[in-house]
Swiss-Prot record:
Its main location: cytoplasm. Nucleotidase that shows phosphatase activity on nucleoside 5'-monophosphates. Its EC number is 3.1.3.5. SUPFAM superfamilies: SurE-like. This is 5'-nucleotidase SurE. NCBIfam families: PRK00346.1-3 (NF001489), PRK00346.1-4 (NF001490), surE (TIGR00087). Belongs to the SurE nucleotidase family. It catalyses: a ribonucleoside 5'-phosphate + H2O = a ribonucleoside + phosphate. It is found in: Cytoplasm. A divalent metal cation binds at D8, D9, S39, N91. Binds 1 divalent metal cation per subunit. It comes from Haemophilus influenzae (strain ATCC 51907 / DSM 11121 / KW20 / Rd). Its cofactor is a divalent metal cation.
Length: 249
């Protein structure tokens, strides 16, 4: 098996290096990742400037682009040979609920899915036990073979920031959701000009049993199938009925 690994925290982040080291025990691995932190880049592609991949001594690559750029580049003729699986992570911090909208970690996996490959996104609910998340991924890859064959979904994994031995197990979950975003942070820079920072993530609003928030909070690894199709199917009929009524008045 040959695995393409990417992330949004950047090539030099601890999470991706720990992940690649562990994956290399079970497969051939090549990293193509951003050359800097590109957190919350979502699925953006770089269209107004060229991508410049830099070949590193160990055979991996870092790129002056987004996570989606890296996977798009790697799988569209840049890499030679077959790739069997895309794994994105390990993200420093969870990607649960509404986080998935902004996440560059998920975007890299979704780009792999878009290009026809099975894909996994993995995040750690903290910044300490990356080795736990890496072991989880290596443990799950053989077990997820059937599910990974679905070309229209990715698997989103969130891991509690605990030693591996303290994990309670695995739960398949739906996404929870957070409350409205907190206000931006207003400051003055050294030139006395007003600047703004995007604030931290809002607190979970739906962390009921069955959600990813609930699982991770209670010591379980959450496993959530994610699809790129954003259609609200439950609203199609009611919207069509409304439209029909409006045009028959």
């Amino acid at each position: 098996m040959r695995i393409l690994v990417s992330n949004d925290d950047g090539f030099h982040a601890e999470g991706i290096q720990v992940l690649a080291t562990e994956l290399r025990k079970i497969a051939e691995v090549i990293i193509v990742a951003p050359d800097r932190n590109r957190s919350a880049a979502s699925s953006s592609l770089t269209l107004v400037e060229p991508l410049r991949p830099r070949h590193l001594d160990n055979g991996d690559y870092c790129v002056n682009g987004t996570p989606a750029d890296c996977v798009h580049l790697a799988l569209n003729g840049f890499l030679s040979g077959q790739v069997d699986l895309v794994v994105s992570g390990i993200n420093a911090g969870c990607n649960m609920g509404d986080d998935t909208i902004y996440s560059g970690t998920l975007a890299a996996a979704l780009e792999g899915r878009h290009l026809g490959l099975p894909a996994i996104a993995v995040s750690l609910d903290g910044r300490q036990h990356y080795e736990t998340a890496a072991r989880v991924v290596c443990d799950l890859i053989p077990k997820l073979q059937h599910q990974l064959l679905n070309p229209r979904e990715i698997i989103n994994i969130n891991v509690p920031d605990l030693p591996f031995e303290e994990l309670k197990g695995y739960k398949v979950c739906r996404l929870g959701y957070r409350s409205s975003s907190v206000e931006v942070i207003k400051q003055r820079d050294p030139r006395d000009e007003t600047i703004y920072w995007i604030g931290p993530s809002a607190l979970p609003e739906d962390e009921s049993e069955g959600t990813d928030f609930y699982a991770v909070k209670n010591g379980y690894v959450s496993i959530t199938p994610i699809q790129a199709d954003l259609t609200a199917y439950h609203s199609l009929l009611s919207l069509q009925n409304w439209l029909d009524q409006e045009f028959t008045k």
